[in-house]
Amino acid sequence: MSTDELQLTFFVFLQLIIRAMKKTELIINPDGSLFHLHLLPGDIAEKIIIVGDPGRVEMIAEMLDSVRVRKSNREFYTVTGTFRETEISIISSGIGTDNIDIVLNELDALVNIDLATGMTVEEPRSLTIVRIGTTGGLQAELPVGSFIATTKAIGFDGVLHFYEGYEWCLDHMLADSLVAHLEWPDLLAYPYAVDADAGLLEKLSAGATKGITISTPGFYAPQGRRLRLEPFDNELNDNITSFRFKGQKITNYEMESSAIYGLSKLLNHKALTLCVVIANRVTGEFLADYKPAVRKLAAHVLEELSS
């Protein structure tokens, strides 16, 4: 074999390796859908509601005037339809920022990557993403059943640290102030803070308390709960409750918003989280029948997204 033939063979082999790598970067199912969400381009609307519970997707879908897409895989259930002539998708993410990493990246790929070539489209689109969820209140004055609009999301999870060039979208002063207040240990991921989309916050926050939200990487010790295992800091919740930043309080715990806000900023999407307080961690009050409150919040979001 000549030198030219060897070079050509090597080039072809190299291209095959590159293509194989790309296939493991953006995994496509045999039907052309994305690996986890099992969605095709065109299955989603530009306005999207994210919930954790797949059952909550169906609850909100019942309010739609019509439905054109119903698809599910694992914990990811998607319904796309119309409300007041506005197309809206409702998608369940499951629990946690790790799942949000999947959902946000695959939603973005559906509108901003040519799935056949793996190339970014010439004119990227911006999605409107609203998370509707439940939450634990961290201030005594927040009654169960009330709504919270997340002005800033603080991540204890570390997901955003795995992405290059994310620093521009962070509120460093807020994160550094909280780290100092909590005497945050070096062995944990450094907290990061990201703002909500200002336009969505103004449009959708009527009737809600505005506050800073902490997204944790777990439900028990990461939120100060004790069962058989003790959390590393028994005063964590008290110290979070007493924290102030430019007159603002940390109002609640949940497990998704930091990644939603951070990835949305990096991918040029608009994001907001609205939650129903179902437990007040200060007073110990718990709302067992919280579904009517979630339904009320969802109706409000649908009305505002369609106006």
What are these regions (language model features)?
Residues 237-247, 253, 257-263:
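A short, acidic, amphipathic alpha-helical segment used as a generic capping/interface helix at domain edges
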Residues 258-290:
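Zn-dependent metallopeptidase/amidohydrolase metal-coordination segment
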Residues 1-3, 8, 14-16:
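Short, often N-terminal, low-complexity regions
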Residues 21-192:
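Metabolite-binding pocket within alpha/beta catalytic cores that recognizes anionic/polar moieties
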Residues 50, 54-57, 93-100, 104, ...:
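Generic structural signal for well-ordered, non-membrane alpha-helical segments
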Residues 136, 153, 214-221, 259, ...:
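Glycine-rich beta-alpha junction loops
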Residues 174-245:
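Active-site rim beta-loop-alpha module in soluble metabolic enzymes
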Residues 280-307:
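His/Asp/Glu-rich mid-to-C-terminal helical/loop segments that flank catalytic regions of hydrolases
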